[in-house]
Swiss-Prot record:
The keyword Cell membrane does not apply. GO terms for biological process: mitochondrial electron transport, NADH to ubiquinone. Belongs to the complex I subunit 3 family. The gene is MT-ND3. This is NADH-ubiquinone oxidoreductase chain 3. It catalyses: a ubiquinone + NADH + 5 H(+)(in) = a ubiquinol + NAD(+) + 4 H(+)(out). PANTHER family: NADH-UBIQUINONE OXIDOREDUCTASE CHAIN 3. Core subunit of respiratory chain NADH dehydrogenase (Complex I) which is composed of 45 different subunits. Interacts with TMEM186. Interacts with TMEM242. It is found in: Mitochondrion inner membrane. It is a multi-pass membrane protein. Keywords: Electron transport, Membrane, Mitochondrion, Mitochondrion inner membrane, NAD, Respiratory chain, Translocase, Transmembrane, Transmembrane helix, Transport, Ubiquinone. Core subunit of the mitochondrial membrane respiratory chain NADH dehydrogenase (Complex I) which catalyzes electron transfer from NADH through the respiratory chain, using ubiquinone as an electron acceptor. Essential for the catalytic activity of complex I. The chain crosses the membrane at residues 3-23, 55-75, 84-104. InterPro entries: NADH_UbQ/plastoQ_OxRdtase_su3, NDAH_ubi_oxred_su3_sf.
Amino acid sequence: MNVMLTLMTNVTLASLLVLIAFWLPQLNIYTDKTSPYECGFDPMGSARLPFSMKFFLVAITFLLFDLEIALLLPLPWASQTNKLTTMLIMALLLISLLAASLAYEWTEKGLEWTE
C-alpha cells in the first residue's frame, strides 16, 4: 500500500508539473521577448545555425592530439620502471606516433581552412 501511495503521488506531481510547464508560458507573451534588440538578432528565428565542417574536423583533430599528449605527460610516473632506456623508448614511440599523425594530417590537407 505504501508503494502504491508513493507511486501515485509521484505520478500526480510529475503530471502536474508537466501541465504547468506547458500552460504557464502561453499566458503571457511579452513583446520585449519577441522583438529583435539593437544588434538585429531575431530571438524567435531558427536555432540551427550553419556550422563549418572544416572547423569541426580541425577541432576533432586538436582533441585527438590533445588526448595523445595527455597520455604522454604522465608516462614517466605511470611506467614505474627503473630502466631509463625502456621509458625513453616508450616516450619516443609515442612522440613518433604523434609526429607521423601530424605529418599525415598535413599531407592530406586536414589542417587547412581553405579548400
